[in-house]
Amino acid sequence: MFTLTQLCPTPLENARQLHLSLTAEERCRRRLHCHSDEGESLYLKLPRGITLQPGDRLRDEDATVIVTVHAKPEPTLKVMASTPLDLLRAAYHLGNRHVPLEIHTDYLRLGADSVVQTMLEQRGLTVTFEVAPFCPERGAYHAH
């Protein structure tokens, strides 16, 4: 088992390279037992305040392994609107409910939630279930 304790801003040439696919919720956890995409047993033991993003690299204390983080496909809702203003209003209502949200110019993505889906559909938005990588916006006061 490799214990990953810190971010690695630059690649290390001699370290073993692994990949780790995590859901949006898992990327917020400081402590997590998991397996790399290659099947290696991993333990995340990260400092407070770290929210992992796709492309982040983690390393163990000895720098024997570097693990690149990826967004794991998960159940999501893709929200589309007939006008940009309707999409903006949807983002407002979702933000007002503190719903983690991935924002694009022509659609929004959020974790699958039937109650929120119903609310959005009642507002006339097109909501589609998709299994896709989910990368919600980080908070305005987040520092990485």
UniProtKB/Swiss-Prot annotation:
GO terms for cellular component: cytoplasm. It holds the Pfam family UreE_C. Its main location: cytoplasm. Keywords: Chaperone, Cytoplasm, Nickel, Nickel insertion. Disulfide bonds: none annotated. GO terms for biological process: protein folding; protein-containing complex assembly; urea metabolic process. HAMAP family: UreE. Belongs to the UreE family. This is Urease accessory protein UreE. It comes from Thermosynechococcus vestitus (strain NIES-2133 / IAM M-273 / BP-1). The lineage of its organism: Bacteria, Bacillati, Cyanobacteriota, Cyanophyceae, Acaryochloridales. The gene is ureE.
